[in-house]
């Protein structure tokens, strides 16, 4: 038995990959754990539309009916959105158990990367990656996303790490694991809702084509994933000091209620949504759409690079 027995790829995504067309993977914990129905369904449809408008095929990934689904759509997408309250949150450690036990799960950045790589998708758009939580020196709460980035050949386009995390420690961990952090038209690592964290990226890139060349060579050299940090649009960015005050309040609430481990991030995001009177969610949707557009452009550039490489190989032959 191989991974192919547990992977279900939609016909649209399969045809696109076979034809060398650009495909962008999308995660599903934002659907199952990020916002309520029907806003979650509206959001994913908007994000998929952004990917299409920018020339690529969207591939929303989730665990459903004992399969890792790549390219969830139609009635299944609505079922995923409606069932969010009952769905599990699947990281790397959960995949085998959830595939055997069945049920439905939203995939984290780590699991989405795994499924994308197995399917042959090289570019993935998300909101923000997980990372080192504040206080990790005592809780050891560090996301599996960072380890996955070090070993799986997928480029992740994001608005940095979620602001609720310890961003300096997250970047140090990425450095330890040899994960290159590329700033898309920026030298400052973005902080999800805020455009700047005060921390520097490893390398600034100016275009999707430039990003594609770096990513392609990274993979050709047999190295792991690449993080492309793309700041939230200025029109939707939140004030860094104001959001920090809300984050600190949300963390105090989590500590008071004993919330920890994989329940912590959804709890904090929900509490911050309440404290900002919904502004954080509006910003979240805007940054995901922005990342989807950039990811589609990078996927298109990588597809064109692949086509040129094949042409050169044929010419030499």
Swiss-Prot record:
Mn(2+) binds at residue 141. Its cofactor is Mn(2+). The active site is at residues 27, 162. Binds 1 Mn(2+) ion per subunit. One of its GO terms (molecular function) is hydrolase activity, acting on glycosyl bonds. It catalyses: D-ribose 5-phosphate + uracil = psi-UMP + H2O. Its EC number is 4.2.1.70. One of its GO terms (cellular component) is cytoplasm. Pfam families: Indigoidine_A. GO terms for biological process: nucleobase catabolic process. InterPro entries: Indigdn_synthA-like, PsuG. Substrate binds at residues 89, 109, 143-145. It is an enzyme of class 4 (lyase). Gene3D superfamilies: Indigoidine synthase domain. Keywords: Glycosidase, Hydrolase, Lyase, Manganese, Metal-binding. Catalyzes the reversible cleavage of pseudouridine 5'-phosphate (PsiMP) to ribose 5-phosphate and uracil. Functions biologically in the cleavage direction, as part of a pseudouridine degradation pathway. Belongs to the pseudouridine-5'-phosphate glycosidase family. Homotrimer. This is Pseudouridine-5'-phosphate glycosidase. It comes from Sorangium cellulosum (strain So ce56) (Polyangium cellulosum (strain So ce56)).
């Amino acid at each position: 038995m191989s991974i192919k027995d547990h992977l279900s790829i939609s016909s649209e995504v399969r045809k696109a990959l076979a034809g060398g067309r650009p495909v962008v993977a999308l995660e599903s914990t934002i659907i199952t754990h990020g916002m309520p129905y029907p806003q979650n369904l509206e959001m994913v449809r908007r994000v998929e539309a952004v990917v299409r408008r920018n020339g690529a095929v969207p591939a929303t990934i989730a665990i459903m009916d004992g399969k890792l689904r790549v390219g969830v759509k139609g009635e299944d997408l609505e079922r995923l959105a409606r069932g969010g309250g009952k769905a599990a949150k699947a990281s790397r450690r959960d995949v085998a158990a959830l595939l055997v036990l069945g049920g439905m799960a939203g995939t984290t950045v780590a699991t989405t990367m795994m499924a994308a790589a197995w399917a042959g998708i090289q570019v993935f758009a998300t909101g923000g990656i997980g990372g080192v939580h504040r206080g990790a020196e005592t809780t050891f709460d560090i996301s599996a996303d960072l380890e996955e980035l070090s070993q799986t050949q997928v480029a992740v386009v994001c608005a940095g790490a979620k602001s609720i995390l310890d961003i300096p420690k997250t970047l140090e961990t990425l450095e330890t694991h040899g994960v290159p952090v590329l700033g898309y038209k920026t030298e400052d690592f973005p902080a999800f809702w805020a455009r700047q964290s005060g921390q520097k990226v490893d390398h600034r890139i100016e275009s999707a084509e430039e990003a594609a060349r770096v990513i392609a060579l990274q993979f050709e050299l047999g190295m792991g994933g690449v993080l492309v940090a793309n700041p939230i649009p200025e029109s939707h960015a939140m004030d860094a000091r104001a959001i920090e005050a809300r984050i600190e309040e949300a963390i105090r609430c989590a500590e008071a209620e004993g919330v920890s481990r994989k329940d912590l991030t959804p709890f904090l995001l929900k509490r911050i949504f309440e404290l900002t009177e919904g502004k954080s969610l509006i910003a979240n949707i805007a940054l995901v759409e922005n990342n989807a557009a950039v990811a589609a452009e990078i996927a298109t550039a990588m597809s064109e690079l692949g086509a040129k490489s094949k042409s050169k190989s044929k010419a030499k032959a």
